[in-house]
From Swiss-Prot:
The gene is tdk. This is Thymidine kinase. It comes from Ureaplasma urealyticum serovar 10 (strain ATCC 33699 / Western). The keyword Oxidoreductase does not apply. It catalyses: thymidine + ATP = dTMP + ADP + H(+). Homotetramer. It is found in: Cytoplasm. The active site is at 97 (proton acceptor).
């Protein structure tokens, strides 16, 4: 006899929506949640208080928005769900701007999924340095479904996979603060080849040597 959920999925999993800035991550989160309304599925959205761009709402750059609950940290999500304010008919939890939470969000997401909640998470995959942002690398491992979106490179029009930060027209230094809330005044989406981070350190002793070698090789080829 086939197992009970051979052709359907038991409720309780994690969906991750990620990518660079201007890729439509929040818009996709809102779209998925709005879609559930056709099936009369109730949901609740949380976001970190550090995101000051739209108080008490998650808002996409296309203008769509949803009410949300701001929390100081990930465990507050569990506390709210255990409180008298929580509607027990809610089975879907949305979490936006997940990169601003610490690693405790991974445990929160797993606990929710293990207890029958569908958890839909959105956030940046990389910081301005091009490195995993906050808990995102671990969430890649924990997520049951992953959607990686791209934007359009502001420099060449190719698919953009990185978020570039500039301050007063200058590239942000590798040692600059990781979190700097802002939009187009500081950031643009770029492809790998137009992503610049001055003073980025290299772990391998011969990495810089290889970069110089390859640049010289290309230069000599064009002579």
């Amino acid at each position: 006899m086939a197992k009970a959920h051979a052709f359907s999925k038991k409720v309780g999993w994690i969906e991750l929506i990620t990518g660079p800035m201007f890729a439509g991550k929040t818009a996709e989160l809102i779209r998925r949640l709005h879609r559930l309304e056709y099936a009369d599925v109730k949901y609740l959205v949380f976001k970190p208080r550090i995101d000051t761009r739209s108080t008490q709402n998650i808002k996409s750059r296309t203008g769509t928005s949803l009410p949300s609950i701001e929390v100081e940290n990930a465990p507050e999500i569990l506390s709210y769900i255990m409180s008298d304010n929580f509607d027990n008919e809610i089975k879907v939890i949305g979490i936006d701007e997940v990169q601003f939470f610490d690693d405790r969000i991974c445990e929160v997401a797993n606990i929710l999924a293990e207890n029958g909640f569908v958890v839909i998470i959105s956030g940046l995959d990389k910081n301005f340095k091009g490195e995993p942002f906050g808990p995102i690398a671990k969430l890649f491992a924990y997520a049951d479904k992953i959607t990686k979106l791209t934007a359009i490179c502001n420099e060449c029009g190719a698919e953009a996979t990185h978020s570039l930060r500039k301050i007063d027209g200058k590239y942000a230094n590798y040692d600059d603060e990781i979190v700097k809330i802002g939009c187009q005044e500081f950031y643009s989406a770029v492809c790998r080849h137009h992503h610049k981070v001055p003073n980025r350190p290299y772990l391998n002793a011969n990495s810089e040597e290889f970069i110089r070698f390859f640049k010289n090789k290309k230069r000599n080829k064009n002579v």
